[in-house]
């Protein structure tokens, strides 16, 4: 720049460093501008505008320096690293190494002992630590490709710590076991904390077989069975079972007629396989399905006799079993008996009047019509029905009453009745005469109407000649379906005649003997007999069984026949065995067990009404067994009282083989008192209950050694539907077997452990004495030091 005053313009100062910024240039420009302004203000001529140099460019240079690696440090001695000391140590090198090696050896020995102990506690562990360590390198490569499957941990049940002085017998008597773990991805389910062990097993339904029978001699004996179950209401033992007609008569208002042509209260007699055994039935049907159905029972009895008491050759004379239909007939009362209230009332009055005339009210058997009617009354009734000269040449004889007092209301074979009829008589007169003869044998029923005579005449052509073309079983079904009363009575007479012929010749007795030696009493027989006994004794008083105190030991519930049959099969009940039911109720299981297996049966019930019914059922069952030609066990008794105080229960438990306790609703105190009775049971006896007496976590130790539960070995089982009366579904029940070997083994091993401990003490007497001396010296030394400290403290205080 040129200066007009002859001087040079001041040169711009060079930047001090290459990193100067444009801000400095701007600062210089402002300075020069201010100086020129000041010069113009001083009167000097204006200067030319100077050119500003461009701002310098900033250049950033990055320099990379190579850092030298750190100096390598020599690795430390592994033994020195383990010991924590530096190489420079006060101890000599050899001694220091020896100490470290001994420490490592002790650690290895300790790890080996711990692994062995873990293997003994968990024997299912497959891999040891050494094997798992050697295979870790091989699994590490595969771990990147697929995820590891985590094994469930096994829970080991340890023993009690306060009984180590008895060796292994301070532990539980049951083997330790593991509980299954729940998968992490699944929902949490209930885990059984008490799995199967030697003393507690869960077998479910294994070994259960249907239709348990015991081959034995089942023929009825002439000597009465030993029993003390005498009915409370009567002092003398009845000689005959309660008939079906007696049960219906006592509740006649709930029944109505079923057959046409038989009147309001028709009676029929059914022959049984036993000697001179028969039963009287009223051929009526109930209005309600819950009531007793006499017609269905009669047909069921016929079917059972033909099925089980006859050989295939003998069965041909009765017909095919498929042709006999047995079903409930409740509510199927004749329409004529239900037209209006007046008709129903008159029908009931007629039935009551007929039953009163036959002396059938209140359980008394109807007398024979021949005993009620004289010759004059019979002649008058005959003349009223068919005229004076129609019957005098027939030659028909009215059958004599049975020696047992039961009226023979069912006619004998129609062929014998019509053998003396004149050949000149027409078909209508013959049919009418047959019907009149039937009516004469049923004098408690009204005379048949003309409609019934016509229906009887037009039923089949063979009926006019006194024979039926169908078999006996088929005729029963046809008469029931058609409501044909006369046909039903003729068919029943044919059945009685054929069965009596087999009974009189001894064929039925031989069949019963063969049946007993092959299979014993079939299920179809003992079930039917038990239903008959229950319907006659318990059925009329079933409402009284509901009178009990709720939430007490007297809550009533029954075990059904299917359940008892399963228990008998699993416990191998049979002859020469003793069965005891504690809380026997009405005695159903006593009756079933005695007849099905032939075992002695004893029961005890606290409540008065069920105990009374049980006594009556036992008597009725024995009478019915004789009617069927059968016999039960050698003894059957039902007692009333508390089984904890009853003397008979104490005596019979000493030789019992199976004890049944329905303790489903028992209080805990009752179960505890009941378990004390099990101490009298012999080895091998089984206790069946619905609640376990031995909990699954029971442990046999010195504390529980005196418990009555220590001698029981438990098996948990499952029952299905149809086994109990209070629930439709299934449940659990328990069979506890008396096994005193558990306690004996415990005591033997505990004694061996004690003797071994005493032997160790005797061998180390010197060591023990020396150790006692050292302990004594140590104690005296501590006391001397404490005394010195006390003296020092006293001196300080002074």
Swiss-Prot record:
Q: Where is the composition biased (Polar residues)?
A: 108-117, 175-184, 220-242, 405-414
Instruction: Provide the DOT1 domain boundaries.
Output: 439-751
Q: Where do the annotations place S-adenosyl-L-methionine binding?
A: 556-559, 579-588, 605, 642-643
UniProt superkingdom: Eukaryota
Q: Where in the cell is it found?
A: Nucleus
The EC number(s) this enzyme carries: 2.1.1.360
Q: Which Gene3D superfamilies match?
A: 1.10.260.170, Vaccinia Virus protein VP39
Q: Which UniProt keywords apply?
A: Chromatin regulator, Methyltransferase, Nucleus, Repeat, S-adenosyl-L-methionine, Transcription, Transcription regulation, Transferase
Low complexity: bias regions: 9-22, 29-42, 53-73, 125-146, 415-425
Coarse class of the primary localization is nucleus
Q: Which InterPro entries match?
A: DOT1_dom (IPR025789), H3-K79_meTrfase (IPR030445), SAM-dependent_MTases_sf (IPR029063)
Class of the enzyme per the UniProt entry, highest EC level = transferase
The answer to whether the entry has keyword Nucleus is: yes
Q: Name one Pfam family in it.
A: DOT1
Other facts: In contrast to other lysine histone methyltransferases, it does not contain a SET domain, suggesting the existence of another mechanism for methylation of lysine residues of histones.
Q: What does this protein do?
A: Histone methyltransferase that specifically trimethylates histone H3 to form H3K79me3. This methylation is required for telomere silencing and for the pachytene checkpoint during the meiotic cell cycle by allowing the recruitment of RAD9 to double strand breaks. Nucleosomes are preferred as substrate compared to free histone.
| The protein's name in its UniProt record | Histone-lysine N-methyltransferase, H3 lysine-79 specific
Species of origin: Mycosarcoma maydis (Corn smut fungus)
């Amino acid at each position: 720049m040129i200066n007009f005053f002859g001087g040079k313009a001041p040169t711009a100062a060079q930047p001090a460093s290459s990193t100067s910024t444009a801000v400095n240039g701007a600062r210089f420009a402002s300075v020069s501008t201010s100086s020129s302004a000041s010069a113009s203000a001083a009167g000097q001529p204006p200067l030319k505008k100077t050119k500003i140099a461009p701002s310098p460019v900033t250049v950033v240079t990055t320099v990379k320096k190579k850092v030298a690696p750190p100096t390598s440090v020599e690795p430390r001695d592994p033994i020195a690293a383990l010991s924590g000391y530096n190489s420079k140590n006060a101890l000599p090198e050899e001694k220091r190494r020896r100490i470290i090696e001994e420490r490592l050896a002790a650690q290895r020995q300790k790890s080996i002992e711990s692994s062995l102990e873990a293997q003994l506690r968990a024997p299912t562990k497959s891999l040891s630590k050494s094997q798992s360590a050697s295979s870790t390198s091989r699994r590490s490569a595969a771990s990147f490709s697929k995820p590891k499957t985590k094994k469930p941990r096994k829970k080991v049940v340890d023993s009690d710590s306060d009984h180590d002085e008895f060796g292994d017998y301070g532990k539980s008597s049951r083997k330790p076991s593991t509980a299954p773990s729940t998968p992490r991805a699944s929902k949490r389910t209930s885990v059984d904390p008490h799995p199967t062990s030697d003393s507690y097993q869960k077998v479910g339904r294994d070994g259960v077989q249907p239709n348990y029978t015991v081959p034995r001699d089942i023929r009825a004996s002439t000597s009465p069975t030993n029993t003390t179950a005498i009915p409370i209401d009567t002092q003398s033992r009845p000689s005959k079972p309660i008939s079906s007609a007696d049960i219906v008569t006592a509740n006649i208002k709930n029944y109505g007629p079923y057959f046409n042509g038989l009147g309001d209260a028709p009676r029929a007699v059914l022959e049984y396989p036993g000697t001179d055994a028969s039963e009287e039935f009223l051929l009526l049907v109930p209005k309600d399905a819950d009531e007793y159905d006499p017609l269905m029972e009669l047909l069921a009895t016929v079917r059972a006799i033909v099925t089980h008491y006859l050989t295939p050759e003998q069965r041909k004379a009765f017909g095919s079993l498929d042709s006999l239909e047995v079903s409930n007939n409740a509510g199927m009362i004749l329409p004529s008996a239900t037209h209006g209230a007046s008709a129903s009332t008159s029908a009931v009055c007629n039935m009551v009047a007929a039953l009163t005339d036959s002396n059938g009210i209140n359980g008394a058997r109807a007398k024979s019509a021949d005993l009620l009617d004289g010759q004059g009354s019979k002649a008058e009734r005959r003349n009223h029905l068919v005229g004076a000269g129609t019957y005098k040449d027939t030659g028909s004889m009215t059958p004599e009453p049975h020696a047992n007092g039961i009226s023979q209301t069912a006619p004998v074979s129609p062929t014998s009745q019509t053998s003396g009829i004149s050949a000149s008589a027409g078909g209508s007169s013959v049919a009418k005469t047959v019907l009149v003869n039937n009516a004469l044998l049923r004098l408690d029923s009204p005379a048949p109407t003309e409609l019934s005579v016509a229906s009887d005449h037009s039923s089949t052509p063979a009926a006019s000649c006194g024979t039926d073309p169908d078999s006996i079983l088929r005729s029963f079904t046809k008469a029931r379906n058609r409501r044909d009363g006369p046909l039903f009575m003729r068919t029943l007479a044919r059945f009685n005649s054929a069965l009596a012929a087999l009974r009189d010749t001894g064929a039925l007795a031989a069949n019963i003997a063969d049946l007993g030696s092959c299979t014993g009493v079939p299920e179809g027989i003992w079930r039917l007999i038990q239903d008959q006994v229950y319907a006659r004794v318990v059925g009329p008083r079933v409402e009284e069984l509901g009178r009990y105190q709720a939430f007490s030991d007297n809550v009533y519930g029954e075990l059904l026949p299917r359940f008892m049959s399963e228990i008998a099969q699993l416990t191998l009940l049979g002859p020469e065995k003793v069965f005891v039911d504690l809380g026997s109720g009405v005695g159903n299981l006593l009756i079933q067990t005695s007849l099905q297996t032939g075992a002695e049966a004893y029961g005890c019930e606290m409540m008065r009404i069920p105990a009374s019914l049980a006594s009556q059922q036992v008597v009725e069952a024995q009478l019915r067994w004789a009617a069927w030609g059968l016999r039960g066990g050698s003894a059957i008794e039902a007692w009333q009282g508390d089984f904890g105080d009853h003397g008979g229960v104490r005596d019979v438990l000493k030789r019992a083989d199976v004890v049944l306790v329905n303790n489903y609703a028992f209080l805990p105190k009752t179960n505890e008192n009941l378990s004390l009775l099990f101490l009298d049971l012999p080895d091998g006896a089984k206790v069946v209950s619905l609640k376990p007496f031995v909990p699954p976590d029971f442990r046999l130790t010195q504390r529980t050694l005196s418990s009555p539960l220590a001698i029981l070995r438990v098996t948990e089982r499952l029952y299905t539907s149809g086994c109990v009366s209070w629930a439709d579904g299934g449940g659990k029940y328990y069979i506890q077997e008396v096994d005193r070997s558990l306690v004996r083994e415990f005591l033997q091993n505990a004694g061996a452990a004690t003797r071994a401990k005493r032997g160790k003490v005797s061998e180390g007497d010197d060591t023990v004495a020396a150790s006692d001396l050292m302990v004594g010296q140590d104690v005296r030394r501590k006391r001397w030091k404490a005394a010195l400290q006390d003296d020092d403290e006293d001196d300080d205080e002074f």
